[in-house]
UniProtKB/Swiss-Prot annotation:
It comes from Mycosarcoma maydis. Its EC number is 3.1.-.-. Its main location: nucleus. Pfam families: GIY-YIG, SLX1_C. PANTHER family: STRUCTURE-SPECIFIC ENDONUCLEASE SUBUNIT SLX1. It is an enzyme of class 3 (hydrolase). The gene is SLX1. Its cofactor is a divalent metal cation. Keywords: DNA damage, DNA recombination, DNA repair, Endonuclease, Hydrolase, Nuclease, Nucleus. It is found in: Nucleus. Residues 308-324, 627-640 have a biased composition (Basic and acidic residues). This is Structure-specific endonuclease subunit SLX1. Residues 12-92 form the GIY-YIG domain.
Length: 658
């Protein structure tokens, strides 16, 4: 049986989600799915195949998700550890625990103990005379779920997967921000150059922005009203004040109103709501939002027509889509809610909030554009980007066709190659999984900072699409990233034995825009480029034309295509007209047939006496031939026979009675 490793690919989107019941806010649920909007509808009973455990506490709201997994198996591992933190081996005390800023702490006395021990047991009820087995239950409060998520993101191996966060409610985002503010050593995420590396629990250096988080307060399905777009009375009912509330100083003897959640150092207020966090509108002055969708330039996928929103439909919550996930309305992505002018608050201004997209379209488009520029620089420096890319793909198409036949496999064109920027060994550019491009971060994948004071958005870092034209072997770039991590002064022995890196910078990139990137994003971009390359090769083989002819078709071809489309439309209209005429003709025939039958019936009624007299005259010859006439039935038969015989007689045979 062939190995599945050769056909492995990273899914465009797969996430673990955190559900919270609206009817009983203390009830939570953890799951995983490639389509969060559809999964929420299943849990709420709008679609079939929802979880049995969520059928009672409906309706449910999705608080946040953790996405960016490399496979379904990886997502299931994270889901199990998140749902059962008291049993997970990843959430146990290490011999030495490191804080976020890398400060070590000796915890050898608690080594092997759970960070989130069970605080309750199942009730010991009896069933059919037998005692029910008491089992430890995991801490399942909303605060415990959020704290367990933060602990997992800093634990190995999950800390090296480049996972990302998306928050769909104000409470989950604000609670996460309050926990970050309590961590010593963390600085504001305003400029990437001033950030310091974060560290895992075992002391491994992480990316300064890890984990990257975005907010979509319109909900995972777009049916939720963000608090920044509602009036002041609604915000007060939700527990959000207009200005910060001064806390009363409590005595030292009084215990703080926080939930005791195991030995994990972070804590949250016991009441898991915005009022318990003392939320105010200043807390939501700025928050990260997703990037708008990039224009789709893939020739193998048909672009959908954009629908213009009317003024009445614009304030409403916009539906999100997922082509494979069965969600509707992908054409609209920006939610602009016009707030009431009588609010008088600067935070009540209209703020465009981009919807969360559950795909890798932005990364794919940015990576393909960088690939085209690298091909033009390394393979066809004297030609334009389109011409160089067209010739490169034409060579790959010819090689693919020649490889299908054993007789022409050896006579195929040579593969386009380029030297590795680190080892100077030629790289076969037709094998997309053998090399990577410049690992500088794609600006289209970084979050935007939504601010209430400015109408424009700024990225979470100031880097732009400034990737260089370097090409590396995958193994060469991995070694370069590992060397950069080992050069860190705070790197521990556990990070020295790491096989794969977590982040790094381009070794050949020069200039001010040299930014670190996550290794998971480098591998994900490589798979997105590989999948698009394979689709495009098959598309060009079927069409029989080059890439340049598809992008810039000749005038004759364009007129032919337009003419064929016009002919198809004319044929369709003519066919529709003919069908309509046939329907009208059928209706007329039905009406005329009904009218003729009615007239015939009336005519038969008027001519009935004449017919009876003729029949009476024709009876005698039949009687002479020996036919018996018995009763009414015999008379009817004679009437029929005489009528048919009278119709069949010619004019010469009719007896003139005059």
């Amino acid at each position: 049986m062939p190995s599945s490793v050769t056909k492995h690919t990273i899914p465009p989107f797969y996430a673990c989600y955190f559900l919270r019941s609206l009817s009983t806010p203390g009830t939570t649920y953890i799951g995983s799915t490639p389509a969060p909007p559809r999964r929420k509808r299943q849990h709420n009973g709008h679609l079939t195949q929802g979880a049995y455990k969520t059928s009672r506490a409906r309706p449910w709201e999705m608080e946040c998700i953790v996405y960016g997994f490399s496979s379904k198996i990886a997502a299931l591992q994270f889901e199990w550890a998140w749902a059962k933190p008291h049993l997970s081996r990843h959430l146990k005390f290490l011999t030495t625990e490191h804080s976020v800023d890398g400060t070590p702490k000796n915890t050898s006395d608690w080594a092997g103990m759970s960070l989130f021990p069970s605080t309750s047991l199942t009730p010991g009820q009896t069933r059919w005379g037998r005692p029910k087995k008491r089992m430890a239950r995991p801490p399942s409060s909303p605060n415990a779920r959020l704290l367990a998520m933060r602990a997992l993101l800093r634990s190995e191996p999950f800390c090296g997967w480049g996972l990302k966060l998306a928050f769909f409610t104000e409470w989950s985002w604000l609670a996460y921000q309050r926990l970050d503010a309590c961590d010593p050593g963390l600085v504001a995420k305003s400029a990437l150059s001033t950030l310091q590396n974060r560290y895992s629990r075992s002391g491994k250096p992480l990316h300064a922005l890890y984990p990257v988080a975005v907010c979509d307060f319109s909900g995972v399905d777009g049916k939720r009203e963000p608090l920044v777009h509602v009036s002041e009375p609604y915000r007060l009912d939700a527990g959000v004040a207009e200005h910060p509330v001064k806390k009363r100083q409590t005595s030292s003897r009084q215990k703080p109103h926080t939930e005791e959640t195991s030995a994990w150092p972070e804590t949250l207020p016991r009441s898991a709501n915005l009022k318990g966090l003392d939320a105010c509108m200043q807390d939501f002055a700025t928050f990260p939002i997703p990037q708008p969708a990039a224009p789709n330039t893939d020739l193998t996928k048909k672009s959908k027509r954009a629908k213009k929103l009317s003024d009445k439909a614009r304030p409403s919550a916009l539906e999100d889509h997922d082509a494979e996930n069965g969600v509707d309305d992908d054409d609209t992505e920006v939610e602009v809610v016009a707030t009431d002018a009588a609010n008088g608050s600067d935070l009540a201004l209209s703020r465009p909030l981009y919807r969360m997209r559950f795909d890798d379209l932005n990364m794919e488009e940015s990576e393909w554009k960088r690939f085209a520029e690298s091909i033009a620089a390394n393979v066809g420096a004297s030609r334009s980007t389109t011409q160089a890319m067209s010739e490169f793909l034409h060579t790959c198409v010819q090689r693919h066709i020649a490889a299908q036949d054993a007789r022409t496999a050896n006579t195929a064109l040579p593969a386009p190659t380029s030297l590795c920027s680190l080892c100077s060994i030629p790289i076969d550019l037709s094998q997309q999984l053998d090399f990577v491009l410049c690992p500088n971060p794609h600006a289209s994948t970084l979050p935007l900072i939504s601010s209430s004071s400015t109408a424009s958005h700024e990225t979470i870092s100031e880097c732009r699409e400034t990737g260089c034209d370097s090409i590396f072997h995958l193994s060469c770039l991995a070694r370069s990233f590992l060397e950069q991590q080992l050069g860190d002064q705070k790197a521990t022995a556990s990070s020295a034995s790491t096989v794969l890196p977590t982040h790094g910078t381009c070794p050949c990139h020069r200039g001010e825009h040299k930014e670190p990137t996550m290794w998971a994003d480098v591998v994900r971009a490589m798979y997105r480029r590989h999948e698009r390359f394979e689709r495009l090769i098959q598309f060009l083989i079927r069409s029989g034309r080059s890439l340049e002819q598809h992008l810039h078709p000749p005038l004759e071809v364009e007129m032919t295509v337009k003419g064929s489309k016009i002919k198809e439309r004319v044929k369709a209209s003519v066919k529709a007209t003919e069908d309509a005429q046939v329907d009208i003709g059928d209706q007329r025939q039905v009406i005329s047939g009904t009218t003729s039958r009615t007239k015939a019936a009336l005519t038969r009624k008027r001519r009935q006496p004449t017919t009876s007299s003729v029949n009476a005259i024709q009876v005698d010859p039949l009687a002479r031939n020996g036919s018996k006439i018995d009763g009414d039935g015999a008379g009817k038969d004679t009437k029929k026979n005489t009528t048919q015989k009278a119709k069949s007689n010619e004019t010469s045979e009719v007896i003139d009675l005059t």
